[in-house]
């Protein structure tokens, strides 16, 4: 039996000391594909390094997690995102979306960045991986407003 882990952040420092064993164990257990959603520019390099080390098993995505959408850093995050899309191959745009669980005051900026990332997914013909907490109706409105038949993806949260 073969399985796909559709959402794992194995590139984070918590796995640094035993990542090779974790991936070996996953493969031996039948989990042969590991999909790696990005968080923000701080995780891109480690994610890409892991996918290069295990090109048959680890597949990177690129995106800005809604909890990483901050007024003071969003311009540099967007520049990084667009540069990465030009320079690398990604499975999807993700993990993107809206998250009001921790902080509700950034909703309008999260909505703007979520919309922009969906537009990039449409432009690059990539599916999206959506993260939503306590903002499902708002997220659906954005997706419906864009109304694009080319858009596909999954909700992870």
How would you describe each model-predicted region?
Residues 1-157:
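Mid-domain alpha/beta scaffold segments of enzyme catalytic cores
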């Amino acid at each position: 039996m073969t399985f796909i882990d559709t959402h794992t952040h194995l590139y984070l420092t918590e796995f640094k000391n035993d990542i090779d064993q974790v991936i070996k164990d996953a493969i031996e257990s039948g989990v042969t594909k590991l999909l790696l959603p990005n968080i923000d520019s701080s995780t891109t390099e480690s994610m890409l390094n892991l996918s290069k080390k295990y090109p048959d098993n680890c597949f990177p995505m690129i995106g800005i997690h809604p909890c990483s959408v901050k007024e003071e850093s969003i311009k540099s995050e967007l520049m990084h995102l667009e540069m990465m899309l030009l320079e690398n191959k990604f499975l999807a745009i993700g993990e993107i979306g809206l998250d009001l669980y921790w902080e509700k005051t950034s909703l309008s900026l999260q909505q703007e960045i979520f919309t922009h990332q969906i537009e990039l997914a449409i432009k690059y013909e990539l599916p999206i991986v959506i993260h939503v907490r306590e903002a499902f109706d708002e997220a659906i409105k954005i997706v419906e407003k864009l109304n694009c038949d080319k858009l596909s993806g999954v909700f992870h949260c």
